Amino acid sequence: MSNFDQEFDASGLNCPLPILRAKKALTAMASGQVLHVIATDPGSVKDFDSFAKQTGNALLESTEEGGKYHFLIKKG
């Protein structure tokens, strides 16, 4: 996993909560900073891809490990 500035664990939360919490966290971050999100909802894979495209942020990494999905989102 690459370097990141902030992390939050959305394990156990279902759509749309991981996206809403990521949006809130990114709002408080500076442009160029990276947020690491951990989720367990399989739907979060396509959700975070769409979210990044719609909001002008960059999805740097999307991986699955042991039933947990890890996303690195760079604030645009």
Language-model features and meaning:
Residues 4-11:
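Short amphipathic
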Residues 11-13, 40, 74-76:
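Generic beta-structure capping elements
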Residues 16-58:
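Amphipathic, hydrophobic secondary-structure cores in small proteins
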Residues 49-76:
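C-terminal structural segments of small proteins and small subunits
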